[in-house]
Amino acid sequence: VTAARTPGRLSPRWRQRGALSLLLGPSVLLIAVFVIAPACYGVYLAFTDTQLTGWAARDPQFVGLENFRHLLGSEDFLASLGRTGQFVFWSAIVGQTLLGMLAALLLRAKWLRGKGLFGSLVLLPMVVPEVVASLTWASVLSSDDSGTFNRLLAMFGSGAAAPLQDSPMLSVIIINVWRGIALAMIMFQAALEDVPDELIEAARMDGAGALQVFRHVTLPLIRGPVFLYLLLTTITTVGVFGLVYFLTQGGPGQDTELSSIYIFQRAFQYSQIGMGSAASVILLVLLMVLGLTYARLAKVKV
C-alpha cells in the first residue's frame, strides 16, 4: 500500500534541490556581481573611447574595432606582448615548473634529511605578500653600496653592480621563479603521491635509472596535473603586475614593460580606459587559445 503524501510537504528531491540552491545561491551571486559583470563591462568598454577625464569620460562613444586596430598596429603593444611571452616562458614554464618538480621529487627522496625545513623554505616566498617581496628585493638589489647584493660583492673584492638597471628582465624572472616554486612543488607533490610505488620498483628491477624511471614511468602518469599547472601558472604569470611595477615600473626604458604594465599605463596614467580594456580583451583571447592548446596537448577533454 502506497502511503499518501501529506499535503503541503515537499518531496525529498525538491527539498534537496532547495537546499542546494540555498547553499550555492550566495556564491553564484557573488561571482556574478564581482567577476562576470565587471568582465562583461570591460569587454563593452573595449569597443568605446571611454576615458577617465574629458568629454569622453562623460559621454563615451562606440568606436567598434578602432581600439583593436590601433593596438594591433602599435609597436609598443606588440613589443609588450613579446616581453610578456618571454617572461612567462622563462619564469613560469621553465623556471617554476622545473624547480618545482625537482623540489617535489626531493621531498619524496628517502635519503633527504630535514624535509620539513626544506619544504618550509620553499613555501616561505608563497606566504610573503607581493608588495613586501618586491620592496625587499628592490632593497637587496639596490645599486647603492648599502644594498645587500653589493655588500656581498664587496666582501669578495668585487665592484658594485646594478642588476635592476643592467639586467632588469633577468632580475624579475629570477624573482618570479623564487615566488612561484612553492605552488609547483605542492601540485607536483600531490600528483606524485598517486604514482604507484610498484611501477617504480618494477622499472628499477628492469635496470632503469632515475632519469629513465621519471621519463617513462612517472611523467606519463602525472601528465594531466603537469599541464594543469602549466595552464594555471601561465594565467597567473601573464597577470603579474605588482612584482614588476614595484621593482622596475616597466623600465629602464621599456625593458620590463609587460602587457600588464602597458594596460595599467594606458588605462590609468594616460586615462585611456577603452584602449586599456581592448588590450585586456586581446590578452584574454590569447590566454584562451593557450588554454585550449594545453588541454589538447594533455589530451584532456574540455
Show the residue positions of the predicted features.
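A structural signal for multi-pass alpha-helical bundles of membrane permease subunits
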Residues: 13-302
